[in-house]
Amino acid sequence: FDRWQQGKANEGEGTMWLSRQHHDMQIKGNPVGYYIPDYNSLDISNGTLLVLAHYNVQNDKINRKIRLVDDVVYEVDLATRKIIWTWKASDHIDEMGFDNAALKAMQNYENEPKTEGGGFDWFHQNCVSYLGPNKWFNGGDRRFHPDNLILDSREAGILAIVDRQSGRIVWRAGPYYRDGDDKKLGWIIGPHHTHMIAKGLPGEGNILVFDNGGQSGYGPPSDMAPNGIGVMRRQHTRVIEFNPLTKEIVWEYSPSTANKPDQVLGIKLFSPFISSAQRLPNGNTLITEGANGRVVEITKDFDLVWEYISPYLWDSSAPGARNLVYRAYRVPYDWVPQLSKPPEIPVDPGANYRFVIPAEDGSKPDFGIGRTPIWKRQTGGQ
């Protein structure tokens, strides 16, 4: 399945066969790719594999002047290693709900990159997975057939479900969030890791998405987006879980929902690219704030119970190297059988005003630790 397109892997090298795989691949048998209790037996010698890849095409409906870096999903038979099904995003432009202003902005894009394999990255799909068994299909809604695919577009701000048989988009949120049921979601900007929470996990059947913020969407030109590209902008991230039938938000982690009365500056969550969200068996959500290399576990009530910041830099020799993390998953200890299970030590975070850095000799200054802080005495704790 790597014989998909001829190209150069690196400048100066000869032409070779490339799959041009990017962002995601999923083996059928686990719809989300992360741990689900009693649902983790994968036969990698049989079944099928979804691969998300790039493919350069010309499509005059999108842009008459330059080629596209299109997104293509191909399904591979693992036994024969043959491609048995293909879906190209550009073939379905008429099913995506773009208005005339958006289509005009795409037509006006003219910055043809000069690099090998370059072009107009008009859709920028970053995930694909099977829906898997779910209550909506069991209730008679064929849009949610377990073999159907769910995906999203960073550039267009679209979430979509694709019928595996016909290839048509049978369910969609976006690209506009100002009318109808889509309005309940608020604007989804530059999304990543859109997937249906799998059967056996809290929230099963709902859709979970890392709504990055930053900029995305096509529309009329403005001072902020003079070419009509990246017209929707927001400088914070949301993680949202919603009912795909009603599009009612069930749970949202964002500055507007998760701030506590004593948090003067509010929560800090912003990654304008990459990132993900995983529903854990205990009902918590593991969030990868990828641009900052930060992974956190958040409870349903928005408490931070675990945090990790990656110390590893991408290309540490380059100026401005960053500790990016594309996507992190929590897995059980026995998924790494060569390691013994370590002791788990609970941590009491305590109150911030009790945190004191000791001096070089180990002593701690007395700032009234253990007594009611001055601001609480003066305000009555309000």
Please describe what each predicted stretch is.
Residues 1-382:
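Histidine-/acidic-rich catalytic cores in large beta-rich domains
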